[in-house]
Amino acid sequence: MKNKWFWILSIIIALIVTYFTAVPKNETDTRKEVTVWTLQMGDFADYMNNIISKYESAHPDIKIKWIDVPFSEGDKRTLAAILSNNPPDLINLNPDFSAILAQKGTLYSIPENKLSEYNKDIVDSLKYKGNLFAIPWYATSAVTIYNKKLFEQAKLTDMPATYEDLAKYAKQVKVNTGKYIYLPTITENDTMLKILNKYGINSYSNINNNESVKVFNQFKSLYQNNLIPKESITQTHREALEKYMSENIVFFQGGANFLSMIKDNAPNVYKVTDVAPQIKGKLGQNDFSLMNFVIPLKAKYKDEALDFGLFLTNKENQLALAKRTNVISTNKEALTDSFYNSYDGLMSKARSISAKQISHIQPVMRQSNNQKDINTLVNTAVQSVLLNKDNTQNILNKLAKDWKNLS
């Protein structure tokens, strides 16, 4: 009897096992998997996942695979992916590296009519040979951060608006306060090139013209007369910020995000801090930094990537990100929002100024394949001029020749 029940139970178990192994638990996912890379957005996972969830609900045939990449690995991993046969469909990059990839012919050309809702100046900055290579996401634009107490002690009556103004007021500041007017980080990366671009100087063909000599000599005069710190020849934004927080300089150029650092690390200085528009050159345009999305030419789902990219960067989603991070939207409608056009504090004032500056950025500085080498040449020339190693014209003539040889 026991054997009989044992065999019956064995048959039942076998039938159950056969049933569940014969019928798959899940049907195959037939959705298109669009791979999206972002840079350093891990702290905003809830923001990204909410957008992805909304998009997938509206597009049941699409699955978004989101991967966040550290800033330090962005260029390297992107280059490796671009060279492979299976790159991500949508990649978050800075415009400089994006432009280099566009020059190499590795990016999908985005139809310009798809970006009619975005800031035109920014869209125009994302073109190579007339072809649009990226979707703008968010931007920042430096403002002039200054110490009101030192401003008054220096007996200044007008805010400096140009580099010429800074040079003009430098001695007055030094005499009345014993402090420096600012620390120009003119040998940091492409800082000097960005300044020169504000005077229409942007290539080896005009780096040694009269206007360029004048700009270089202006910094030379400040340096030789001890009206800017001697450290200007080597130091970066980090050291300039430290000098501002220790009240050794009156003015500091930086994004609104630096205000948070000042507030946290030098609260007494923050109490006497105010902001004004960015320092300009002869042409009157503003510098800006941008994050954008590109679509590799080898991407499997280019149309789907473009559609998701446009959704991710629409007015609603850009404003939601801006309210979390204080960045500047690139969507024209978003920029008309009261978030950018009214303020009740220092942070919001800086944001409002930055947002207005985004509409005046042309001509932008164009990056080259060998930009780091060009930066090195220019920064070496800056040091030679400041140290008076030769007359400025000779130094710039050599710079023009060396730059041309790189091209």
Task: State where each predicted segment sits.
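Conserved N-terminal structural module of periplasmic/extracytoplasmic solute-binding proteins
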Residues: 1-98, 158, 280-283, 303-304, ...
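Extracytoplasmic/periplasmic substrate-recognition and gating elements
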Residues: 53-58, 63-65, 224-227, 264-328, ...
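Extracytoplasmic "Venus flytrap"/periplasmic binding protein-like
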Residues: 54, 59-121, 149-154, 161, ...
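Hinge/lid segment of periplasmic solute-binding proteins
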Residues: 94-143, 165, 175-177, 270-279, ...
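A ligand-binding cleft/hinge motif common to bilobed small-molecule-binding domains
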Residues: 98-100, 255-270
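Periplasmic solute-binding protein
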Residues: 99-106, 122-159, 184-204, 287-295, ...
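Glycine-centered hinge/linker elements that transmit conformational signals in sensory
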Residues: 170-172, 205-236
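C-terminal capping/gating helix-and-loop segments adjacent to ligand/active sites or protein-protein/ligand interfaces
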Residues: 348-404
